[in-house]
Structure formats: structure tokens, C-alpha cells
Amino acid sequence: MYGGSFTKQEVVIAMTNAKRIFYYLVCLTGLGIMSGGAGILLSLLCGLIPGNASAVIGGRGFNNEQLSLGLSMLITGGALWGFFWHYIQGNVALDKPESGSSVRKLYLTLIQLAAALIGVYAAMDVCVWLLGGADAGTLPSGRLATWIVATVCWYYHWHLSEKEGHTSQPARVLRGWYIYILSGWGLVMASASLMHLMENLIIHLPFWGHTIISGPIWNRALQGNISGMVFGGITWYFYWFRMAQDDHESMLRQIYIYLLTISGSAIAGIVALTNICYRLIRYIFGGVVPSGVAYFKFTGWAIPLLLISLLVWLYHRRLVQEEAYQFPDRKLSGIRIHVYIMAFLSLGTLVAGLVILMGILLDLAGVAMASSATVSSGWWRDQLSLCMALLLAGIPLWIYYWNQIKHRLTENETAERQSSSRRVFLYAILSAGVILLAADLVNIIYQLLSCWLQSRSGTSLWLGIKWSLQTLVIALPLVGYFWRIIRQDQRYGAEMAARHKRVMVLISAESAELVKKIEEKLGYGVIKLWTSGQLPAAVSLLSEDNVSGIASEVQSVSSQQVMLLVWDTAWKVIPYQEG
């Protein structure tokens, strides 16, 4: 590079982290400038298509300026990127481990992520133009150029990244973030576009008349929905079914499935169901505005949202069940997480309905104390409609999933009480309840003192503490109920799960099923050491009592490091310390 040649040792020493960061930052800058210049030149080239209006916008002088700017950016950025990228690639060729450096993987991942998103959005705009008739006069030259440049940039770096592989832990983590961000984005884009597409079709049905919509059904909004559905679906399919198909052990995959897809679709579905129930109940109570068929316009988005959310939820729930049986060591964990997530969401819906119900009862008490002039006719309709909608959505779900949780306790009480999912669920509810109680008490005491010191009226005091009272009345028994459950779990040793022992099991390979049962009882994994025939198989110890006895003896040992020997009809627990 500087008139001489580097040996492999010299290259390794030269590429320190500081130097590596500098080189990749310069490459990123050069690539951005070069891509911008290429986009400008391609946009001008598209403007030469006969009939394209962009060819005359700004006049000849403007086009010459764009040509000069594009060429200068392309030459400068290309030279900058080419020089430093050539040096980096030379280092990679001489030193293979360099291809797995965290800085390099971060660079490749960021470019792939940015190029993919920019390219897909540009492709959606071009697709809208095609669906709108592909008029040469309205050709989006800039967006077409952006799509081409972003696609070339993405493919080059994606192909390079996949060719080099992802052997290091940082590389796998970065690749996981990249895959699941784009997979999630594609799923959300496709689902939202499909929902709006169905909404457009529903509100254009003839029985609505002209009270809701006007104009043709084939409009730019519908074309945009189709474009988003197509490219969102393609993005989701590529990253979920191709890129993530073998990534079953990744923690990011579990976050994606449980937090984004299952929880997200459940929340969206509950919102849609609650809205439908609320609107229908409100209509039954009467006094709605607008009246007639126009009132049911909400079905245009609520029903599609409910159906799409249900489909997404059902697909990923089935996926969780399939992976649970495909990977038995994660069977209990996967199903357990799903049950507790749904229980938490349904409880939140139920509590919201109860809080509103308590507010209605307090309002009735307030009406009895207030003059009739301060109360509007039919004030209760909206509140009672929302309350009933939340309760109709929350009660069945809560009863179903809470019974599922109680049933799981009867199957494997120790492991269930010690599970992280249960601990997070219980303490999340307890924390929310305690915070709510504290806020309520602060406001009530403040309002009482303020009323006393400022000689305010009783009506003013009532209005100031009403919201705190209605949440306090619901939160207090909720906190008490779940605090009792937590204390009960603690008496069964649930908090011991936070102090996992290092357990090494020496056992014959034929007794693998026994090891799985021991792990289930302990609530965590063990280190398996398979013998080569010296110890007879311990098949006779597979009974529930024997497994519970082994797990209890391991937990009762004071040492955090335990060796477990299992053979034939006996076992031996040996505490040890590493020298």
C-alpha cells in the first residue's frame, strides 16, 4: 500500500480496532457519496425517456447542474470508497479471521439494513406508478434510480456477508438483529397494507351510499395498499422463511415471536374486538351521532384488523407449538411464555373495564350529590359501553389463560413456580399495582390537604379524588391477591430459581430421558457427561417420585457445585469445589 508489502503478521498488527473503525467509517462515507451520485445520474438518464415530464423540469441549466453534481459525487465517492475498500479486502484475504471482526460485521449489517429499507420504499413508489397506468409523463425518475442503486448496494454487501459466514458471536447477534428487524417490518407493512386494502374495499360497497366515500375505488390509496402488501410480504417471506429458517436457538427469535408477533397481534386483536363491542353496545343504548348506516363505518377497519391479527396470532402460536415438540428442551418454556403473555394482556383488559365500572358507580354517587344542572343527559352511555366492551373481551380470555396457569401447577408444581416467566408475570403485576396505589394515595392526600387549607368545596374535592378512588378500589385487592400468590410460591422455594446450581450429571447415554425430567424438576439445565458403558442405564428411576427425590437432594445441598452420579436403581449427590 505504501510502496512495500505486508506480511500476514504485519497486517494483523496494523488493523487495530481504532484503525479498523477509521477505515470502515471512510468506506461508509465514500459509499454514501458514490451512491448519491449514481442515483442522480440514473435519475437524469430516466428523464431522457420520451414523454417524461422530469426532462423539462428546471430546464437545461438545471439538468447540467445535476449532471455535474452527480459526476463529481460518483468520481469522488467512488475513488474514496474503492481505495479504502480495496485495502480492507486485502487484509481480509491475508487474514481470514479479519472477516469475522465485529466492526466489519456492523458495517455490513448497517449497509444491508439501510439499503433494504430505502430500496423497498422506493420500489413501493415505483409499483404505485405502475399500477396507476405507468404514464411516462409521471415516471418517478428519482425513486426508480434510488431503487436500482439501493438494490445493487444491498445485493453486493448481502452476498459478501453470506459468503463470509457468521462464525463469531457478535456476527450472529448483528445478523439476528438485521433479520428480525426487517422480518418484523415486512410483517407489519404487509398486515397494515392488507388491513387498509380491505377497509377501502369495504367502504366502497354499494350499501353505504354516498354518505361515506366518493370517487372511484381504483385510486392512489388502493394502489399504495397493494404495493405495501406485495413488497411487505416479499420482505417478510425472504427474511422469515429464508434467512431465519435455521435460527431456532437465537434469543432474538424468541423476542421476535413472543414480543412482536404474539403480543403485538394479541394487543391489536383485543383493541379491534373491544372497539367493535363498544360501538355495537353504544348503538344499542341509542343517542349515537351519526345515525343510520354511516355509524358502522368503523367496521371497515375494525373487522379487517381483528381478522388479520387473529391470523398472525394463530400462525405464530402454531409455530411455537411445532418448535416446542421439535425441540423438547424448550417445550415447557415456549408454551409457558405464551400463556403468561396472554394472561397479562387479558388481565390488563379486565382491570381497565373494572376501573371504568367503578368510575360509573362513583359518578352515580356524584350525581346524587350534584345539582341536575351539572349533569348532561345520557352521560353514562359512553362509559358503560366501553366498560362492557372491555369486560366482554377481557373476562373470557383471563378465565381461560388463568385456568391454564393453574392447571400447569398441577402438572409440575416446582418447575412452574420457579419458572422465570411466572416470576416476571407476578412481579410485573405487583409492581404496576404498587405504583398505582402510591400515585392514588399521593393524589388523595394532596386533594384532602388542599381542600382543607384552601377551603374548597366538597364537589371540587370529589372531582379531584374520583379517578384515584376508582383505581385504588381495584388495585388494592389485585395487589393483595397476587402478593398472596407470590408468598405462596416463596414457601415452595420459588425464589431459589435465582440461585441456579452448577450441576454435572454423570450418566449413561441410554438414560437421556431421565436427565430431561431432572432438568424439568430443577427448573434449569445441567451439564451432561455421558459414560461409555461403565454405568448401567437408570431406566428404573424414571418414576415421578424418584425424579423428585433426585431434584430435592440436589437443591438441599449447600454447595453451588454438585456432581450427580446416576446408575441402575441408585444415585449419588456429591458437592465439589474447583481447585
Annotate each predicted stretch with a short phrase:
Residues E10-E510, L514-E578:
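Hydrophobic/aromatic interaction determinants used to assemble and anchor large protein complexes
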Residues M1-V12:
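N-terminal amphipathic/basic-hydrophobic helices that include classical n-h-c signal peptides
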